[in-house]
Regions:
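Membrane-proximal intracellular helices of multi-pass ion channels
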Residues: 1-446
Protein backbone atom coordinates (compact mmCIF):
# COMPACT_ATOMS: atom_id res chain seq x y z
CA UNK A 1 0.00 0.00 0.00
CA UNK A 2 2.77 2.45 0.96
CA UNK A 3 4.67 1.58 -2.21
CA UNK A 4 1.51 2.24 -4.24
CA UNK A 5 1.03 5.64 -2.59
CA UNK A 6 4.67 6.56 -3.22
CA UNK A 7 4.29 5.50 -6.84
CA UNK A 8 1.17 7.64 -7.22
CA UNK A 9 2.99 10.61 -5.69
CA UNK A 10 5.93 10.17 -8.07
CA UNK A 11 3.58 10.23 -11.06
CA UNK A 12 1.89 13.48 -10.01
CA UNK A 13 2.76 16.30 -12.40
CA UNK A 14 4.15 19.64 -11.29
CA UNK A 15 0.84 21.25 -12.18
CA UNK A 16 -1.07 18.83 -9.96
CA UNK A 17 1.30 19.43 -7.05
CA UNK A 18 0.86 23.22 -7.36
CA UNK A 19 -2.95 22.97 -7.55
CA UNK A 20 -3.24 20.53 -4.63
CA UNK A 21 -0.81 22.63 -2.61
CA UNK A 22 -3.02 25.71 -2.91
CA UNK A 23 -6.15 23.68 -2.13
CA UNK A 24 -4.57 22.18 1.00
CA UNK A 25 -3.50 25.55 2.40
CA UNK A 26 -6.94 27.04 1.65
CA UNK A 27 -8.68 24.20 3.51
CA UNK A 28 -6.35 24.46 6.51
CA UNK A 29 -6.79 28.23 6.60
CA UNK A 30 -10.57 27.84 6.47
CA UNK A 31 -10.53 25.51 9.48
CA UNK A 32 -8.37 27.94 11.47
CA UNK A 33 -10.66 30.87 10.64
CA UNK A 34 -13.69 28.87 11.84
CA UNK A 35 -12.26 28.75 15.37
CA UNK A 36 -13.98 31.06 17.90
CA UNK A 37 -10.59 32.58 18.78
CA UNK A 38 -10.35 33.94 15.22
CA UNK A 39 -13.18 36.46 15.70
CA UNK A 40 -13.48 39.46 18.00
CA UNK A 41 -16.93 38.32 19.12
CA UNK A 42 -15.64 34.87 20.10
CA UNK A 43 -18.23 33.18 17.89
CA UNK A 44 -17.44 30.60 15.22
CA UNK A 45 -17.49 31.62 11.57
CA UNK A 46 -19.48 29.56 9.06
CA UNK A 47 -17.48 27.30 6.77
CA UNK A 48 -18.60 29.19 3.65
CA UNK A 49 -17.45 32.56 5.03
CA UNK A 50 -14.18 31.09 6.30
CA UNK A 51 -13.58 29.34 2.97
CA UNK A 52 -14.22 32.56 1.04
CA UNK A 53 -11.82 34.53 3.26
CA UNK A 54 -9.11 31.85 3.16
CA UNK A 55 -9.38 31.53 -0.62
CA UNK A 56 -9.19 35.30 -1.01
CA UNK A 57 -6.09 35.41 1.22
CA UNK A 58 -4.20 32.46 -0.30
CA UNK A 59 -5.08 33.63 -3.80
CA UNK A 60 -3.97 37.15 -2.76
CA UNK A 61 -7.24 38.67 -3.94
CA UNK A 62 -8.67 40.85 -1.18
CA UNK A 63 -12.40 40.37 -1.71
CA UNK A 64 -13.97 40.06 1.74
CA UNK A 65 -17.32 39.16 3.24
CA UNK A 66 -16.33 40.32 6.73
CA UNK A 67 -14.34 43.51 7.38
CA UNK A 68 -10.84 42.39 8.32
CA UNK A 69 -10.30 44.99 11.05
CA UNK A 70 -13.66 44.86 12.83
CA UNK A 71 -14.61 41.18 12.50
CA UNK A 72 -11.40 39.19 12.89
CA UNK A 73 -9.38 39.07 16.11
CA UNK A 74 -5.61 39.46 16.24
CA UNK A 75 -5.36 35.67 15.83
CA UNK A 76 -7.69 35.75 12.82
CA UNK A 77 -5.79 38.65 11.27
CA UNK A 78 -2.55 36.74 11.86
CA UNK A 79 -3.94 33.67 10.08
CA UNK A 80 -5.04 35.84 7.15
CA UNK A 81 -1.62 37.50 6.96
CA UNK A 82 0.13 34.11 7.02
CA UNK A 83 -2.14 32.87 4.22
CA UNK A 84 -1.37 36.01 2.22
CA UNK A 85 2.37 35.48 2.66
CA UNK A 86 2.17 31.82 1.65
CA UNK A 87 -0.07 32.59 -1.31
CA UNK A 88 2.05 35.52 -2.46
CA UNK A 89 5.40 33.78 -2.32
CA UNK A 90 3.92 30.51 -3.53
CA UNK A 91 3.23 27.20 -1.83
CA UNK A 92 6.16 25.51 -3.51
CA UNK A 93 8.58 28.34 -2.68
CA UNK A 94 7.76 27.97 1.01
CA UNK A 95 8.04 24.17 0.84
CA UNK A 96 11.45 24.30 -0.88
CA UNK A 97 12.68 26.87 1.65
CA UNK A 98 11.64 24.64 4.58
CA UNK A 99 13.36 21.66 2.95
CA UNK A 100 16.58 23.65 2.47
CA UNK A 101 16.58 24.90 6.07
CA UNK A 102 15.96 21.37 7.40
CA UNK A 103 18.85 20.03 5.32
CA UNK A 104 16.73 17.76 3.12
CA UNK A 105 17.85 16.99 -0.42
CA UNK A 106 15.82 18.69 -3.15
CA UNK A 107 14.98 16.14 -5.85
CA UNK A 108 14.37 16.67 -9.56
CA UNK A 109 10.59 16.51 -9.08
CA UNK A 110 10.70 19.33 -6.51
CA UNK A 111 13.01 21.40 -8.71
CA UNK A 112 10.73 20.91 -11.72
CA UNK A 113 7.69 21.92 -9.67
CA UNK A 114 9.49 25.03 -8.44
CA UNK A 115 10.41 25.89 -12.02
CA UNK A 116 6.71 25.86 -12.98
CA UNK A 117 5.72 27.80 -9.85
CA UNK A 118 7.98 30.80 -10.54
CA UNK A 119 7.95 30.52 -14.36
CA UNK A 120 11.71 29.97 -14.43
CA UNK A 121 13.29 29.21 -17.84
CA UNK A 122 15.32 26.22 -16.60
CA UNK A 123 15.58 23.85 -13.64
CA UNK A 124 19.23 24.75 -13.12
CA UNK A 125 19.90 27.02 -10.13
CA UNK A 126 16.31 26.77 -8.92
CA UNK A 127 17.25 26.33 -5.24
CA UNK A 128 19.49 29.40 -5.42
CA UNK A 129 16.62 31.33 -7.00
CA UNK A 130 14.28 30.19 -4.23
CA UNK A 131 16.67 31.44 -1.55
CA UNK A 132 16.99 34.75 -3.41
CA UNK A 133 13.19 35.09 -3.57
CA UNK A 134 12.78 34.42 0.16
CA UNK A 135 15.53 36.84 1.21
CA UNK A 136 14.42 39.61 -1.13
CA UNK A 137 10.76 39.26 -0.16
CA UNK A 138 11.49 39.52 3.56
CA UNK A 139 13.84 42.48 3.04
CA UNK A 140 11.36 44.44 0.90
CA UNK A 141 8.47 43.78 3.30
CA UNK A 142 10.53 44.91 6.30
CA UNK A 143 11.59 48.10 4.49
CA UNK A 144 7.97 48.76 3.50
CA UNK A 145 6.78 48.27 7.09
CA UNK A 146 9.51 50.58 8.41
CA UNK A 147 8.47 53.33 5.99
CA UNK A 148 4.77 52.99 6.88
CA UNK A 149 5.38 52.80 10.64
CA UNK A 150 5.71 56.57 11.35
CA UNK A 151 2.27 57.23 9.84
CA UNK A 152 0.43 54.28 11.38
CA UNK A 153 2.12 54.62 14.80
CA UNK A 154 1.05 58.27 14.84
CA UNK A 155 -2.55 57.38 13.97
CA UNK A 156 -3.06 54.15 15.95
CA UNK A 157 -0.44 54.08 18.70
CA UNK A 158 2.95 52.35 18.74
CA UNK A 159 2.15 48.61 18.92
CA UNK A 160 -0.98 48.73 16.80
CA UNK A 161 0.88 50.98 14.36
CA UNK A 162 3.70 48.44 14.05
CA UNK A 163 1.19 45.64 13.40
CA UNK A 164 -0.69 47.75 10.84
CA UNK A 165 2.58 48.66 9.10
CA UNK A 166 3.66 45.03 8.82
CA UNK A 167 0.20 43.86 7.73
CA UNK A 168 -0.17 46.47 4.98
CA UNK A 169 3.41 46.07 3.77
CA UNK A 170 2.97 42.31 3.28
CA UNK A 171 -0.53 42.74 1.85
CA UNK A 172 0.70 45.34 -0.67
CA UNK A 173 3.83 43.46 -1.70
CA UNK A 174 1.84 40.23 -2.15
CA UNK A 175 -0.76 42.22 -4.14
CA UNK A 176 -3.45 41.02 -1.72
CA UNK A 177 -5.38 44.19 -0.92
CA UNK A 178 -6.47 43.17 2.59
CA UNK A 179 -6.45 46.16 4.95
CA UNK A 180 -7.10 47.04 8.59
CA UNK A 181 -8.26 50.63 8.06
CA UNK A 182 -11.85 49.42 8.36
CA UNK A 183 -11.39 50.19 12.06
CA UNK A 184 -12.35 53.73 11.01
CA UNK A 185 -15.04 52.90 8.47
CA UNK A 186 -15.67 49.23 7.54
CA UNK A 187 -14.76 48.25 3.96
CA UNK A 188 -13.24 51.72 3.33
CA UNK A 189 -9.79 50.45 2.23
CA UNK A 190 -7.24 53.31 2.12
CA UNK A 191 -9.66 56.12 1.23
CA UNK A 192 -8.76 58.01 4.42
CA UNK A 193 -5.14 58.17 3.18
CA UNK A 194 -5.91 59.44 -0.34
CA UNK A 195 -3.62 62.48 0.05
CA UNK A 196 -1.03 60.97 2.43
CA UNK A 197 2.16 60.89 0.30
CA UNK A 198 4.09 58.28 2.32
CA UNK A 199 1.25 55.74 2.39
CA UNK A 200 0.45 56.29 -1.30
CA UNK A 201 4.05 56.07 -2.49
CA UNK A 202 5.11 53.11 -0.34
CA UNK A 203 2.00 51.05 -1.13
CA UNK A 204 2.30 51.75 -4.87
CA UNK A 205 6.00 50.83 -4.97
CA UNK A 206 5.33 47.60 -3.04
CA UNK A 207 2.52 46.70 -5.45
CA UNK A 208 4.67 47.28 -8.53
CA UNK A 209 7.75 45.51 -7.13
CA UNK A 210 5.67 42.50 -6.07
CA UNK A 211 3.93 42.39 -9.44
CA UNK A 212 6.89 42.49 -11.86
CA UNK A 213 8.05 38.95 -11.16
CA UNK A 214 10.89 37.20 -9.37
CA UNK A 215 12.95 36.70 -12.56
CA UNK A 216 12.82 40.44 -13.24
CA UNK A 217 14.27 41.00 -9.76
CA UNK A 218 17.10 38.68 -10.76
CA UNK A 219 17.86 40.78 -13.83
CA UNK A 220 17.86 43.94 -11.71
CA UNK A 221 20.22 42.30 -9.21
CA UNK A 222 22.61 40.95 -11.84
CA UNK A 223 22.63 43.78 -14.38
CA UNK A 224 21.58 46.88 -12.38
CA UNK A 225 20.76 49.67 -14.89
CA UNK A 226 22.20 47.91 -17.96
CA UNK A 227 18.79 47.26 -19.51
CA UNK A 228 20.26 45.83 -22.72
CA UNK A 229 21.56 42.86 -20.73
CA UNK A 230 18.11 42.01 -19.33
CA UNK A 231 16.31 38.95 -20.67
CA UNK A 232 13.68 39.74 -23.27
CA UNK A 233 10.82 38.90 -20.86
CA UNK A 234 11.98 41.51 -18.34
CA UNK A 235 12.15 44.18 -21.04
CA UNK A 236 8.60 43.36 -22.13
CA UNK A 237 7.39 43.45 -18.52
CA UNK A 238 8.93 46.88 -17.90
CA UNK A 239 7.49 48.26 -21.14
CA UNK A 240 3.95 46.97 -20.60
CA UNK A 241 3.92 47.80 -16.87
CA UNK A 242 5.00 51.38 -17.59
CA UNK A 243 2.31 51.85 -20.22
CA UNK A 244 -0.41 50.30 -18.02
CA UNK A 245 0.45 52.72 -15.22
CA UNK A 246 0.96 55.90 -17.25
CA UNK A 247 -1.95 55.76 -19.72
CA UNK A 248 -4.76 54.90 -17.24
CA UNK A 249 -3.37 57.52 -14.82
CA UNK A 250 -3.75 60.15 -17.54
CA UNK A 251 -7.36 59.11 -18.14
CA UNK A 252 -8.22 59.21 -14.44
CA UNK A 253 -6.49 62.58 -14.03
CA UNK A 254 -8.33 64.31 -16.87
CA UNK A 255 -11.72 62.60 -16.87
CA UNK A 256 -12.55 61.00 -13.49
CA UNK A 257 -11.00 63.23 -10.81
CA UNK A 258 -11.00 66.64 -12.49
CA UNK A 259 -13.05 68.20 -9.68
CA UNK A 260 -10.61 67.50 -6.80
CA UNK A 261 -7.59 69.60 -5.68
CA UNK A 262 -4.45 69.20 -7.80
CA UNK A 263 -2.24 67.17 -5.44
CA UNK A 264 -5.09 64.86 -4.43
CA UNK A 265 -5.91 64.51 -8.12
CA UNK A 266 -2.34 63.40 -8.87
CA UNK A 267 -2.16 60.85 -6.02
CA UNK A 268 -5.65 59.42 -6.57
CA UNK A 269 -5.20 59.11 -10.35
CA UNK A 270 -1.84 57.38 -10.01
CA UNK A 271 -2.99 55.05 -7.23
CA UNK A 272 -6.15 53.97 -9.09
CA UNK A 273 -3.95 53.24 -12.10
CA UNK A 274 -1.51 51.03 -10.15
CA UNK A 275 -3.87 49.13 -7.85
CA UNK A 276 -6.28 47.46 -10.35
CA UNK A 277 -3.56 45.18 -11.68
CA UNK A 278 -4.15 42.77 -8.79
CA UNK A 279 -3.54 44.82 -5.63
CA UNK A 280 -7.07 45.57 -4.42
CA UNK A 281 -6.46 48.69 -2.35
CA UNK A 282 -8.31 51.86 -3.32
CA UNK A 283 -8.07 55.49 -2.23
CA UNK A 284 -11.22 56.63 -4.03
CA UNK A 285 -14.87 55.56 -3.98
CA UNK A 286 -15.06 53.37 -7.08
CA UNK A 287 -18.86 53.52 -7.18
CA UNK A 288 -18.54 57.22 -8.14
CA UNK A 289 -16.54 56.46 -11.29
CA UNK A 290 -18.22 56.65 -14.68
CA UNK A 291 -18.98 53.42 -16.54
CA UNK A 292 -15.98 54.12 -18.76
CA UNK A 293 -13.76 54.44 -15.68
CA UNK A 294 -15.13 51.21 -14.22
CA UNK A 295 -14.64 49.41 -17.54
CA UNK A 296 -11.03 50.62 -17.68
CA UNK A 297 -10.46 49.17 -14.21
CA UNK A 298 -12.08 45.89 -15.32
CA UNK A 299 -9.63 45.67 -18.25
CA UNK A 300 -6.66 46.38 -15.96
CA UNK A 301 -7.89 43.76 -13.47
CA UNK A 302 -8.12 41.12 -16.18
CA UNK A 303 -4.60 41.89 -17.43
CA UNK A 304 -3.06 41.61 -13.96
CA UNK A 305 0.64 41.49 -13.13
CA UNK A 306 3.60 39.60 -14.56
CA UNK A 307 4.60 35.90 -14.63
CA UNK A 308 6.34 34.43 -11.61
CA UNK A 309 5.16 37.28 -9.36
CA UNK A 310 2.78 37.69 -6.44
CA UNK A 311 0.15 38.98 -8.87
CA UNK A 312 -2.63 37.23 -10.76
CA UNK A 313 -4.57 37.97 -13.93
CA UNK A 314 -3.81 37.02 -17.53
CA UNK A 315 -0.36 38.62 -17.12
CA UNK A 316 1.32 41.53 -18.89
CA UNK A 317 3.30 39.17 -21.12
CA UNK A 318 0.10 37.50 -22.36
CA UNK A 319 -1.22 40.90 -23.45
CA UNK A 320 2.10 41.78 -25.08
CA UNK A 321 2.27 38.51 -27.03
CA UNK A 322 -1.31 38.84 -28.29
CA UNK A 323 -0.86 42.47 -29.37
CA UNK A 324 2.47 41.73 -31.03
CA UNK A 325 0.97 38.69 -32.78
CA UNK A 326 -1.88 40.82 -34.14
CA UNK A 327 0.58 43.48 -35.33
CA UNK A 328 2.65 40.84 -37.11
CA UNK A 329 -0.50 39.77 -38.99
CA UNK A 330 -1.27 43.38 -39.98
CA UNK A 331 2.32 43.83 -41.17
CA UNK A 332 2.22 40.48 -43.00
CA UNK A 333 5.20 39.17 -41.05
CA UNK A 334 5.61 35.45 -40.54
CA UNK A 335 6.81 35.59 -36.93
CA UNK A 336 6.08 37.52 -33.74
CA UNK A 337 9.09 39.05 -32.04
CA UNK A 338 10.24 41.36 -29.23
CA UNK A 339 13.58 43.16 -28.94
CA UNK A 340 15.18 41.06 -31.66
CA UNK A 341 13.89 37.74 -30.29
CA UNK A 342 11.30 35.51 -32.01
CA UNK A 343 8.34 34.25 -29.94
CA UNK A 344 7.66 30.48 -30.25
CA UNK A 345 4.31 29.48 -31.75
CA UNK A 346 3.46 27.47 -28.62
CA UNK A 347 3.73 30.65 -26.54
CA UNK A 348 1.26 32.42 -28.83
CA UNK A 349 -1.16 29.46 -28.57
CA UNK A 350 -0.88 29.51 -24.77
CA UNK A 351 -1.51 33.27 -24.71
CA UNK A 352 -4.61 32.90 -26.89
CA UNK A 353 -5.88 30.03 -24.71
CA UNK A 354 -5.38 32.02 -21.51
CA UNK A 355 -7.08 35.08 -22.99
CA UNK A 356 -10.11 33.11 -24.20
CA UNK A 357 -10.41 31.24 -20.90
CA UNK A 358 -10.32 34.42 -18.81
CA UNK A 359 -12.81 36.26 -21.02
CA UNK A 360 -15.29 33.36 -21.08
CA UNK A 361 -15.13 32.73 -17.32
CA UNK A 362 -15.30 36.46 -16.57
CA UNK A 363 -18.39 36.94 -18.76
CA UNK A 364 -20.21 33.74 -17.79
CA UNK A 365 -19.54 34.31 -14.08
CA UNK A 366 -20.75 37.90 -14.35
CA UNK A 367 -23.94 36.93 -16.18
CA UNK A 368 -24.77 34.19 -13.67
CA UNK A 369 -24.20 36.51 -10.69
CA UNK A 370 -26.19 39.31 -12.36
CA UNK A 371 -29.13 36.97 -13.00
CA UNK A 372 -28.97 35.27 -9.59
CA UNK A 373 -28.64 38.46 -7.55
CA UNK A 374 -30.73 40.72 -9.82
CA UNK A 375 -27.99 43.36 -10.01
CA UNK A 376 -26.68 45.39 -13.00
CA UNK A 377 -24.42 43.38 -15.31
CA UNK A 378 -21.61 45.96 -15.07
CA UNK A 379 -21.56 45.61 -11.27
CA UNK A 380 -21.42 41.81 -11.50
CA UNK A 381 -18.70 41.89 -14.18
CA UNK A 382 -16.62 44.20 -11.99
CA UNK A 383 -16.83 41.59 -9.24
CA UNK A 384 -15.91 38.63 -11.46
CA UNK A 385 -13.01 40.53 -13.06
CA UNK A 386 -11.75 41.32 -9.57
CA UNK A 387 -11.99 37.65 -8.59
CA UNK A 388 -10.39 36.02 -11.62
CA UNK A 389 -7.75 38.75 -11.74
CA UNK A 390 -7.12 38.17 -7.99
CA UNK A 391 -7.47 41.92 -7.41
CA UNK A 392 -9.96 42.51 -4.62
CA UNK A 393 -11.55 45.75 -5.77
CA UNK A 394 -15.32 45.83 -5.39
CA UNK A 395 -18.27 48.13 -5.87
CA UNK A 396 -19.42 47.14 -2.39
CA UNK A 397 -21.60 44.13 -3.19
CA UNK A 398 -19.39 41.24 -1.99
CA UNK A 399 -20.82 40.88 1.56
CA UNK A 400 -24.41 40.96 0.28
CA UNK A 401 -24.07 38.27 -2.38
CA UNK A 402 -25.67 34.85 -1.91
CA UNK A 403 -23.95 31.49 -1.47
CA UNK A 404 -24.05 30.59 -5.19
CA UNK A 405 -22.35 33.86 -6.13
CA UNK A 406 -19.74 33.39 -3.40
CA UNK A 407 -18.96 29.90 -4.72
CA UNK A 408 -18.52 31.32 -8.23
CA UNK A 409 -16.13 33.96 -6.89
CA UNK A 410 -14.19 31.33 -4.90
CA UNK A 411 -13.70 29.24 -8.05
CA UNK A 412 -12.64 32.30 -10.06
CA UNK A 413 -10.16 33.41 -7.39
CA UNK A 414 -8.58 29.96 -7.27
CA UNK A 415 -8.34 29.71 -11.05
CA UNK A 416 -6.92 33.23 -11.27
CA UNK A 417 -4.14 32.50 -8.77
CA UNK A 418 -3.20 28.98 -9.81
CA UNK A 419 -3.41 29.89 -13.49
CA UNK A 420 -5.66 28.60 -16.23
CA UNK A 421 -3.04 26.50 -18.00
CA UNK A 422 -1.83 25.03 -14.70
CA UNK A 423 -5.35 23.80 -13.95
CA UNK A 424 -5.79 22.41 -17.48
CA UNK A 425 -2.46 20.57 -17.41
CA UNK A 426 -3.22 19.30 -13.90
CA UNK A 427 -6.32 17.52 -15.22
CA UNK A 428 -4.78 16.13 -18.40
CA UNK A 429 -2.37 13.24 -18.66
CA UNK A 430 0.82 13.27 -20.71
CA UNK A 431 -0.85 10.88 -23.14
CA UNK A 432 -3.77 13.22 -23.74
CA UNK A 433 -1.48 16.21 -24.21
CA UNK A 434 0.59 14.39 -26.84
CA UNK A 435 -2.28 13.31 -29.09
CA UNK A 436 -1.87 12.16 -32.69
CA UNK A 437 -1.88 14.67 -35.56
CA UNK A 438 -4.70 14.86 -38.11
CA UNK A 439 -4.53 15.94 -41.77
CA UNK A 440 -4.37 19.71 -42.21
CA UNK A 441 -7.06 21.74 -43.99
CA UNK A 442 -7.59 25.48 -44.19
CA UNK A 443 -10.60 27.25 -42.68
CA UNK A 444 -11.61 30.84 -43.42
CA UNK A 445 -11.64 33.23 -40.45
CA UNK A 446 -12.53 36.90 -40.17
Amino acid sequence: MQQKNRSRHRHMTSFQVISLGFLSVILLGSLLLMLPIATKSGQSTSFSDALFTATSAVCVTGLVIKDTATYWSLFGQGVILLLIQIGGMGIITIAIAIAVVSGRKIGLMQRSTMQEAISAPTVGGIVRRTQFIIRTTILIEIIGAALLAPVFCRDFGFWKGIWYSLFHSISAFCNAGFDLIGIRTPFSSLTSYSVQPIVNLVIMVLIVVGGIGFLTWEDIKNHKWHLKKYRMQSKVIFMVTGLLIFLPALYFFYFEFSNVPLMERVWVSLFQSVTPRTAGFNTADLTLLSEVGQMLIIILMLIGGSPGSTAGGMKTTTLAVLVSSALSVFRKKEHTHFFGRRIPDDTIKNAATIFLMYIVLFLVGGMVISSTEDIPLMTALFETASAIGTVGLSLGITPDLGLVSHIILICLMFLGRVGGLTLIFATLSEKKLNGSKYPQEKITVG
